[in-house]
Amino acid sequence: MRKEYEHNMSETTYALGHSPAEVQRLKSQGAMLRPITERLLRNVGIDAGMRILDLGCGAGDVSMLAAELVGPEGSIVGIDRSQEVLNVAKERAREGGLHHISFVQASIEAFSAREPFDLVIGRYILIHQSEPVTLLRNAARLVRPGGALAFHEVRVGDDTGSFPHVPLWDRTANLIRNAFQSSLQNYYAADRLVQHFSEAGLPYPHLFCEKLVGGSADSPLYGWLAELLQSLQPQLDRMRIVPGDTFTMEGLENRLRDAVVEARSQIFGPAQVCAWARL
């Protein structure tokens, strides 16, 4: 039987690893980002029956969202270098009854398919690429003529402050920024989407930006910040960054929530920048 997909593996550049805690963090983050990614997909013109490729699919959140939008007559392929995280994605799709998703262990640059896709999408992908222009070209070759290429990226260096000022929130956010500055391959990816698309020989992308904001006790931002710092702890250790004698990870999510609510503060997550182009 002829294989529908061909792939070779190469070394991963994902900075956060795929520990059980990190996979759980990805799932929580996926729920928080879902409305923004859905707006991107709808702006692109996602429709029933489409064939979609999800780059660096991780735990499968974007793949499952796309599968819901294209319906059972469509098809989704999610690729990732980590078989461990793909096993999680496969189980989640099975539990959700989304049988029109296929997950393939593959690197983006080596992946190929017998038929092109109506849409190729990636979320938080370009920030991990040392050669983002090459990745865009590789992704574009998988899109059918008239199809679309779309990316949802995070502006990592964006202000994630609190107003009024909450020292614990701001200190945690600064630690995360410091860790990412030394670990991400393409820290300014969200600021350079027009440049990257242009250098790849692609049409100028359509763009929009949204920012996550919270302040109430039920905001998902507390858990997101605490879990992200936990995943980055090995990187902080390698950088020999010591948070300080008074800083501890124990109960950080609850302490962030208590501090923000007590101060009646408004907290900000990083800007989410989305770009897409029809090819």
Q: What residue spans do the PLM features occupy?
A:
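Conserved catalytic/acceptor-binding region of the Class I
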Residues: 150-219, 238
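Conserved alpha-helix/loop element of class I SAM-dependent methyltransferases that forms part
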Residues: 31-51, 65
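C-terminal helical/coil "lid" or tail adjacent to the Rossmann-like core of SAM-dependent
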Residues: 15, 21-22, 206-267
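A short glycine-rich, Lys/Arg-flanked "PGG" loop and its adjoining helix->strand segment in the class I
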Residues: 133-148
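N-terminal, positively charged/glycine-rich alpha-helical extensions of SAM-dependent methyltransferases
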Residues: 1-23, 27-28
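A short SAM/SAH-binding and catalytic strip from SAM-dependent methyltransferases
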Residues: 118-133
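A short acidic, Gly/Pro-enriched loop at the edge of an enzyme's catalytic core
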Residues: 111-119
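Class I SAM-dependent methyltransferase SAM/SAH-binding core
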Residues: 53-55, 59-110
